[in-house]
């Protein structure tokens, strides 16, 4: 369904707003259910515009997420793109090779302009990178000046691909280099046209982005490539019926065939530069490995989509696929985990982290977390009995009366759960991955080690002298440099937090876990209060923090 807000209006180039009056074929403010064809037509009625008005914007209310169409020219003619002569006349060097794939600190300076931008557009513009040590995707918001110009600096640790987003749903990838400078003239209307189902068939109005500077030719190839070979790995493009009820072996064969077909298409197309082909090959390697590693979750998703059952019931009925002993031999076959070339891709760190959680057959002592917890002398007799009862209920397929209590024990014995998880990861790395690669050395294993220290810092735990002694043993100085900076920032944050004022610590005293919330709020009985619970790793929590700032000021 769609819905047109009754607060919609037209903003004309004379500065006046013309509020919507009514809809013909649609009722304003109510859900309009789309037919199965996905196509429908209706009219929106606005006041008569003065004859002097040439350009309008359609604005569906003033909220950030509301739909907007900017720069509608009433005569149907678009003005010429305002490109500088330097951009028009420049000659790009498509023979330029990719820079060396290595760990190298530096900032990439990004400058440019959003073509056709008006100051009231207020389009969000950002750059997304994947941090190599935390494996977190981080967004850098880019300030756009009233004339559409912008400048930002992106911290990098290697030449790599990043993703830019402009507006609501428009994304494009860019290759950046530490120490490099890249200028981008972003053609807003062509980016919009190329994403529109209705306008895709119309003639392009120039390039989506015009590049000059570091690796400009490669970025030009990336932005003008309409074959989109990597779409084969995008879940939105998958035919889930192909995957529905597949065995793990069929799933593996299916994607390895796609991988070889894509690889062949990349290598055979000599129109692309060698640099671009090498980048595409690296992306193909990465995305195939990610897709194969996510066999269980992807087959579960296909089952939910195609089974015809309600989602919750489908997930409950889905049976985890049986993995053969040689299922993961694609690790040896593709042989990319240790390759520095993976640094070119925007997601290698995500792969490195995810490989530590593969579903594999464990040794007996690592196959039962309950047995591990119960074997610890840190667990009290009373808690051990609850854990046994919970396990018995779970094994019998029953909903345990101790489910809520088990959640509390999960938090209480968090260190034991983390220890067990760490032991499982070590088994996967040393027995499975190292077995297929024939080594425990290399970039992949270095990152696995260093990610543990980065996670410690992310958990607000400063590194110890012993930690730094271990980090200094690494052959690449990047790790010591980066983790030292991360640790210093954490120490500065901790000290700054100690000096903060303007808040009151609400002492709850010694209370049971289930009584904590009541203890916090009981002192304010009869008053309206805002209680903000959040977690640093939680995406929705982070979004809510921004939304709640005005409430906290009130």
Label for each model-derived stretch:
Residues 69-102, 485-507, 517:
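Pro/Ala/Gly-rich low-complexity, hydrophilic intrinsically disordered segments
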Residues 525, 533-550:
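Conserved redox-active cysteine motifs that mediate thiol-disulfide chemistry
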Residues 552-554:
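Thiol-based oxidoreductase modules, predominantly thioredoxin-like and allied folds used
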Residues 49-67, 162-167:
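Short, surface-exposed ligand- or partner-binding patches at beta-edge/loop junctions that are enriched
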Residues 195-526:
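Oxidative protein folding and maturation machinery
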Residues 2-24, 64-73:
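Solvent-exposed beta-hairpin/edge-strand motifs
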Residues 73-274:
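A non-transmembrane, solvent-exposed segment enriched in polar/low-complexity residues
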Residues 21-55:
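Short, solvent-exposed, Trp/other aromatic-anchored flexible loops in extracytoplasmic proteins
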């Amino acid at each position: 369904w769609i819905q047109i807000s009754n607060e919609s209006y037209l903003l004309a180039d004379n500065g006046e707003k013309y509020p919507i009056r009514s809809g013909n074929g649609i009722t304003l403010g109510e859900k309009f259910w789309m037919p199965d064809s996905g196509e429908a037509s209706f009219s929106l009625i606005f006041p008569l515009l003065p004859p002097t008005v040439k350009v309008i914007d359609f604005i569906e209310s003033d909220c950030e997420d509301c739909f907007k169409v900017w720069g509608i020219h009433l005569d149907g003619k678009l003005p010429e793109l305002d490109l500088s002569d330097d951009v028009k006349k420049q000659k790009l060097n498509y023979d330029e090779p990719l820079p060396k794939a290595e760990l190298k600190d530096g900032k990439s300076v990004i400058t440019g302009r959003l073509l056709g931008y008006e100051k009231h557009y207020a389009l969000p513009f950002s750059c997304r990178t994947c941090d190599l040590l935390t494996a977190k995707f981080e967004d850098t918001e880019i300030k756009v000046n009233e004339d559409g110009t912008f400048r930002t600096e992106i911290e990098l640790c290697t030449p790599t691909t990043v993703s830019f987003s402009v507006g609501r749903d428009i994304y494009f990838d860019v290759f950046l280099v530490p120490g490099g400078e890249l200028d981008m003239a972003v053609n807003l209307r062509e980016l919009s046209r190329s994403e529109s189902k209705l306008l895709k068939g119309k003639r392009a109005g120039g390039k989506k982005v015009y590049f000059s500077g570091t690796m400009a030719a490669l970025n030009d190839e990336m932005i003008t490539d309409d074959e989109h070979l990597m779409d084969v790995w995008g879940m939105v493009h998958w035919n889930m019926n192909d995957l529905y009820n597949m065995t793990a072996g069929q799933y593996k064969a299916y994607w390895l065939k796609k991988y070889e077909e894509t690889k062949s298409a990349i290598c055979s197309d000599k129109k692309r530069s060698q640099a671009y082909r090498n980048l595409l090959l690296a992306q193909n390697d990465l995305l195939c490995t990610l897709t194969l590693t996510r066999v269980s979750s992807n087959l579960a998703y296909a089952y939910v989509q195609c089974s015809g059952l309600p989602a919750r019931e489908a997930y409950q009925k889905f049976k985890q696929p049986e993995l053969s002993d040689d299922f993961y031999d694609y690790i040896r076959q593709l042989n990319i985990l240790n390759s520095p070339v993976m640094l070119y891709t925007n997601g290698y760190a995500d792969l490195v982290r995810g490989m530590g959680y593969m579903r594999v057959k464990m040794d007996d002592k690592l196959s039962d977390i309950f047995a591990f917890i119960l074997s610890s002398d840190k667990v009290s007799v009373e808690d051990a009995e609850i854990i046994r009862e919970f396990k018995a209920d779970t094994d019998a397929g029953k909903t345990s009366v101790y489910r809520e209590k088990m959640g509390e024990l999960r938090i209480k014995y968090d260190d034991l759960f983390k220890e067990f998880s760490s032991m499982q990861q070590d088994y996967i790395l040393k027995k499975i991955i190292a077995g297929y690669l024939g080594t425990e050395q290399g970039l992949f294993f270095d990152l696995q080690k260093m990610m543990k220290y980065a996670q410690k810092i992310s958990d607000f735990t400063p590194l110890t002298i012993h930690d730094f002694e271990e980090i200094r043993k690494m052959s690449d100085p990047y790790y010591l440099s980066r983790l030292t900076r991360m640790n210093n920032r954490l120490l500065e944050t901790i000290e700054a937090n100690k000096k903060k004022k303007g808040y009151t610590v609400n002492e709850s005293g010694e209370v049971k876990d289930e009584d904590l919330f009541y203890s916090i709020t009981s002192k304010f009985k009869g008053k309206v209060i805002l209680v903000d619970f959040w977690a640093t790793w939680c995406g929705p929590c982070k979004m809510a923090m921004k939304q709640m700032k005005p409430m906290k000021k009130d």
